[in-house]
Regions:
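Local sequence-structure signature of Cys/Sec-based thiol-disulfide redox active-site neighborhoods
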Residues: 1-32
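Chalcogenol-based redox active-site neighborhoods
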Residues: 25, 52, 80
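Residues that form or flank phosphate/diphosphate-binding pockets in enzymes
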Residues: 16, 39, 65
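Thioredoxin-like thiol-disulfide oxidoreductase module
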Residues: 34-52, 83-85
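Structural micro-motif
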Residues: 49-58, 68
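Anionic group-transfer/hydrolysis microenvironments
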Residues: 7, 35, 62
């Protein structure tokens, strides 16, 4: 299974939605809580090509985008192949 990473903040409904979808699919993921900012927030912005919103999701270092992007991949039937590696 590929490496899945998600940058999130506390009390973020979009973050909850994205994590719920991944959890329902049985996907383990590394979560980085950037609620307080810090170096991980700067890292996220760099990796996400300037995006500052959360969540920001990466699958095997490929930038997927946010919760809506993840949901769109799921609706299009493209998420499972990405998660299969």
């Amino acid at each position: 299974m590929p490496k899945v990473e998600i940058y999130s903040k506390m009390f973020c409904p979009y973050c909850v939605r994205a994590k719920r979808l991944l959890t329902e699919k049985g996907v383990s993921f590394q979560e980085y809580d950037i609620t307080l900012g810090g170096p991980q927030r700067a890292e996220m912005i760099q990796r996400a090509h300037g995006s500052t919103t959360v969540p920001q999701i990466f699958i095997d270092d490929a930038h997927i985008g946010g919760s809506d992007d993840l949901a769109a991949l799921e609706r299009a039937g493209k998420l499972d192949p990405l998660l299969a590696g």
